[in-house]
């Protein structure tokens, strides 16, 4: 998530855009004391108490196994990566031809690379994609409610080139996938694509000054340049839970949603779950989006949580047709530049996107907006940033209290960490879903699930039967 990394880098460098902020009039020590007093009395929280709470919650979740806590999706687990969206396997002969550029990946990175190469007049290109078509992660992630978290007018590339404006401020997966494939059509990338093909190796041949790229189709293509655009989200992760291979009910990974079993589609209507006891393991970004749909359809839904996500206001809305008609040439690049400037710590006269991501910067700016003759020290700026983060997270925790009726469930859904310690989420239906009588939060308080059995899941020492 480049915007998240940009923000975090921004924090570590003590806000380059605000480096000229000045402290006025009073000596530094007195102003810092005043700011501390304000944070406890006026902001309504105790920073020391929150720091202690954050440490306590962090320590519950420290693990010694690192990435070993996940299973590799191969062997007995390879079914979790089977593509449910490919109707038939494409048959073709192995390729051994030479091209100028091979692009690995058919998501937005690969599409952008292929399109720009085409615009530059590079005709001999090859795009290799293991999915059934262009779209990258959006080819796989078609779970109910899946949508972009960044404003779609910024997130979707080539909107102007395709004379396209998304239907919603945060558009959903079907439109994103369709737009991906429209890009492929616009720039004639389909004629250069090898779908259902996975790169297995690359070797540089010094003698002929070419890369040889081998694939699972027996290809041995050569190219002067190779562009890696496979992205970080190209393979599911499975939790290494004891007994995961013993469960006798139906299972699938959300990135390979089994609509043949659940019924319905990306918009919901999962009628196949009407008589089913369903378990969702994890409360990250995908769960935040799909839980409301499963909650409306399943007989019973148990949501297993190790660490709660921060869930802020989404406020999605349809695109205003009058606004769309008023857009002038260059609008999308200007909007992208404005967004990237703000979330990377820069300054802009106007916040064009004006959402949860850019609000973070506004919060930080408001906490260090002093005027005068003495500059804020890096330590003082860092302190102000921490207070701004505390303030925002207090709002998010208060939102859980406001939207969830049961006090114990609301408390368990409160995140106690800095905002970017876990990917921030935005959704208006997730928290209220826990008010439904058929929805149950199983909070493991950082421990995670104990075991998966033939019948269901053991968490907190109790077995919960599932279908």
Predicted regions and their residues:
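Short, Lys/Arg-enriched N-terminal segments with co-localized hydrophobic residues
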Residues: 15, 20-33
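N-terminal FAD-binding dinucleotide-binding subdomain shared by FAD-dependent oxidases/monooxygenases
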Residues: 35-101, 118-245, 249, 260, ...
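Glycine-rich Rossmann-fold phosphate-binding loop(s) that bind the pyrophosphate
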Residues: 105-107, 283-284
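N-terminal Rossmann-fold NAD(P) dinucleotide-binding loop
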Residues: 110, 287
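Active-site signature of alpha/beta-hydrolase-fold catalytic machinery across serine-
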Residues: 116, 293
């Amino acid at each position: 998530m480049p915007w998240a990394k940009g923000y975090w880098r921004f924090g570590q460098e003590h806000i380059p855009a605000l480096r000229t902020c000045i402290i006025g009039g009073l000596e530094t020590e007195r102003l810092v004391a005043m700011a501390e007093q304000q944070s406890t009395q006026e902001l309504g929280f105790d920073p020391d108490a929150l720091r202690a709470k954050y440490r306590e919650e962090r320590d519950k979740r420290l693990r010694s196994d690192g990435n070993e806590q996940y299973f590799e999706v191969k062997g007995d687990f390879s079914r979790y990566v089977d593509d449910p969206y490919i109707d038939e396997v494409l048959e073709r002969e192995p390729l051994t031809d030479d091209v100028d550029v091979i692009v690995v990946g058919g998501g937005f990175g690969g599409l952008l690379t292929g399109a720009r190469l085409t615009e530059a007049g590079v005709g001999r290109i090859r795009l290799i994609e293991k999915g059934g078509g262009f779209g990258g992660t959006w080819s796989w992630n078609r779970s109910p409610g899946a949508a972009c978290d960044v404003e779609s007018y910024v997130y979707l590339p080539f909107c102007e080139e395709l004379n396209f404006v998304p239907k919603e401020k945060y558009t959903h997966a079907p439109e994103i996938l369709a737009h991906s494939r429209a890009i492929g059509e616009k720039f004639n990338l389909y004629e250069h694509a090898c779908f259902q093909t996975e790169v297995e190796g690359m070797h540089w041949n010094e003698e002929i000054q070419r890369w040889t790229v081998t694939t699972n189709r027996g290809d041995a293509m050569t190219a002067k340049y190779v562009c890696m655009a496979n992205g970080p989200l190209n393979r599911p992760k499975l939790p290494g839970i004891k007994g995961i291979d013993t469960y006798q009910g139906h299972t699938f990974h959300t990135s390979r949603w089994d609509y043949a079993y659940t019924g319905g589609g990306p918009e919901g209507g999962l009628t196949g779950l009407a008589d089913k006891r369903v378990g969702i393991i994890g409360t990250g970004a995908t769960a935040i989006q799909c839980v409301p749909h499963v909650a409306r359809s399943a007989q019973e839904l148990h949501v297993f949580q190790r660490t709660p996500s921060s869930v802020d206001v989404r406020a999605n809305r349809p695109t205003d047709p009058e606004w769309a008609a008023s857009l002038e040439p260059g609008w999308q690049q200007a909007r992208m530049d404005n967004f990237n400037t703000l979330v990377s710590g820069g300054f802009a006269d106007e916040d064009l996107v004006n959402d949860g991501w850019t609000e973070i910067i506004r919060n930080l700016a408001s906490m260090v907006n002093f005027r005068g003759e003495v500059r804020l020290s890096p330590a003082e700026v860092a302190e102000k940033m921490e207070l701004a983060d505390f303030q925002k997270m207090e709002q998010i925790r208060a939102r859980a209290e406001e939207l969830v009726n049961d006090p114990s469930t609301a408390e368990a859904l409160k995140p106690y960490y800095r905002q970017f310690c876990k990917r921030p989420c935005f959704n208006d239906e997730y928290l209220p879903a826990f008010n439904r009588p058929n929805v149950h939060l199983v909070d493991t308080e950082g421990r995670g699930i104990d075991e998966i059995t033939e019948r269901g899941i053991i968490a907190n020492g109790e077995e919960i039967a599932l279908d």
